[in-house]
């Protein structure tokens, strides 16, 4: 169902973020927190 699709997408995103490294993730979190996205 939809939940399994969401879980699969989340896993792929997690792997992608891990490959890109923590820097990109931290920048994204920072811009979200400061509403600069």
Curated annotation (Swiss-Prot):
Keywords: Amphibian defense peptide, Antibiotic, Antimicrobial, Disulfide bond, Secreted. Pfam families: Antimicrobial_2. GO terms for cellular component: extracellular region. This is Esculentin-2Ra. Expressed by the skin glands. It is found in: Secreted. Antimicrobial peptide. Signal peptide: none annotated. The lineage of its organism: Eukaryota, Metazoa, Chordata, Craniata, Vertebrata. Belongs to the frog skin active peptide (FSAP) family. Esculentin subfamily. Its main location: secreted. One of its GO terms (biological process) is defense response to bacterium. Transmembrane segments: none annotated. It comes from the Eukaryota. Disulfide bonds join 31-37.
